[in-house]
């Protein structure tokens, strides 16, 4: 199903929304990264709810990553970025968004201690720290009428991916 159409038809309210979309490699997919799309998501997110968005690499596609963050902020949500090493992708970025300010966890719940392979008490705080080459850069808001993310994504990944 088309996520955009589904959100337009849905009237529910959700405590957690997890968004894992295909890369914005064309305008049809790019519309899923616009203020129009995230406005629909914002309307479905409960007052104390959290939305998590898988974005792109803040290292290799830095401007694209921050364009998504800026776009979500433009619809009135607070964004808290984080990143993690994903073996098949490298350093990958995510965004937590909410209506209210979000404070990232500083420790793992006791019931998870020693039970996770990657996420450890030492790794957790580093997820929310961005080194200089991944920190926020100025970025445009991605809208249906400009689709800046599609061009930015293509330009940035074109530098990394051989043809």
Each model region followed by its residue ranges:
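Soluble small-group transferase modules, centered on the S-adenosyl donor enzyme superfamily
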Residues: 4, 9, 78-163
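The AdoMet/dcAdoMet-binding core of the Class I SAM-like
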Residues: 1-69, 73-75, 81, 88-90
